[in-house]
Design a protein with these regions (language model features):
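Short, low-complexity disordered leader/linker segments with a strong preference
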Residues: 1-21, 311-312
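Pocket-flanking alpha-helical
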Residues: 36-41, 54-93, 113-119, 166-171, ...
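Bilobed "Venus flytrap"/periplasmic-binding protein-like clamshell domains
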Residues: 20-46, 50-52, 108-174, 288, ...
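Short beta-strand-centered segments that line the small-molecule binding cleft or hinge
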Residues: 82-87, 99-105
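An extracytoplasmic/periplasmic, membrane-proximal ligand-sensing/linker region
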Residues: 163, 167, 174, 184-204, ...
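Pocket-lining segment of extracytoplasmic ligand-binding domains
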Residues: 78-80, 87-91, 155-246, 252
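Ligand-binding clefts/hinges and TM-proximal coupling segments of bilobed small-molecule sensing domains
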Residues: 130, 136-146, 219-290
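N-terminal secretory/targeting leader peptides
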Residues: 46-55, 61, 70, 198-199, ...
């Protein structure tokens, strides 16, 4: 199940009794994995917690992995986190999961619609096209369905393909699909690689489509991907986002979660130097828009910074 493992181990001279945690992230072609590795490094170096970062199938797998005790930390989409807590949508069959808590919101996860087909200028142009919409019941899948529905389309109006970010990029290059939904922090490695050697571009998700989405679902907000984010991108692209969120097992100790929260937010500049998404780390962003309770350890840290968050 775990395709790739990145161990952020304590040095040999470190304490043998250090807390050990495994962090579930996402595919290696997305932002979660690389960013998770950076966070794991700072949690190890500054909090003394031995973190192993693993590549997974993403948000739902990370929530279920924490529930099963396989992971203690995970990066998730804010909307999928809410589905797990409520037992809705992607968790409707499996049931609700309440064995996790929020550490912090991390960064905007852009819903990126990428194509190499010059005929595709709007979401409506996807009708009849072969489109990758993520794994069934994944966060990406539901984001894609929401966008399609807001544009007056359904899953049956497209030739749906269910692929990972990396597989979607390869399929676009090989002409096997016409477009792909990729939900991740921009720049996303899979899209960066694709645009480096191919004439690919992002399709805006704006206007009436974005307005409909935001009116029907509180998780979505508008976001602008700046010109120059990807090779050949000469203009800003407006889209929608959800929020990448770090969660932790509810059973983790208050002291450990306090220390790992401090390790992240006391080192924002250094983290940003290693991964550009670190620039979005802030107390305000970390604590706003969360629909699931915070862990007491994270709440303690944010309270010291003047922000009180709900823990139940």
């Amino acid at each position: 199940m775990l395709a790739v493992m990145m161990t952020v181990a304590l040095a040999a001279c470190g304490s043998a009794s250090a807390t050990k945690m495994t962090m579930g992230t996402g595919g290696t072609g997305g932002t979660y994995y690389g960013y998770g590795g950076v966070l794991g490094q700072y949690i190890k170096n500054k909090a003394g917690i031995d973190v192993t970062v693993v590549s997974t199938d993403g948000s739902k797998a990370n929530i279920q992995g924490i529930a099963a005790g396989d992971y203690q930390l995970g990066t998730v989409q804010s909307d999928v986190m809410a589905y797990g807590w409520e037992g809705s949508r992607s968790f409707e069959k499996d049931g609700k999961v309440d064995s996790f808590r929020v550490v912090a919101g991390l960064y905007a996860e852009s819903v990126q619609l990428v194509t190499m087909d010059p005929e595709i200028k709007t979401v409506a142009d996807l009708k009849g096209k072969s489109v990758s919409i993520g794994a069934p019941a994944s966060g990406v899948y539901f984001n894609a369905i929401d966008v399609l529905n807001a544009a007056g389309l359904s899953e049956s109006d497209i030739k749906a393909q269910y692929q990972s970010f990396a597989d979607s990029a390869d399929a676009l290059k090989d002409g096997k699909i016409d477009a792909a939904f990729i939900v991740a922090g921009a720049p996303t490695p899979a899209i960066t690689e694709l645009t480096t050697t191919n004439d690919a571009y992002l399709v805006p998700i704006d206007g009436a489509v974005a307005e409909s989405l935001m009116a029907s679902c509180p998780f979505y907000t508008t976001y602008v991907i700046p010109a120059g984010t990807y090779k050949g991108q000469t203009e800003d692209v407006t889209t929608i986002t959800v929020k990448a969120t770090l969660i932790v097992s509810a059973s983790a100790s208050e002291d450990d979660v306090y220390k790992l929260t401090a390790a992240i937010f006391d080192n924002v500049d250094a983290i940003t130097a290693e991964n550009a998404k670190g620039a979005e780390l802030s107390i305000e962003n970390a604590t706003s828009g969360m629909t699931v309770p915070f862990h007491a350890g994270a709440a303690k840290y944010f309270a010291e910074k003047g922000v009180n968050v709900a823990t139940e």
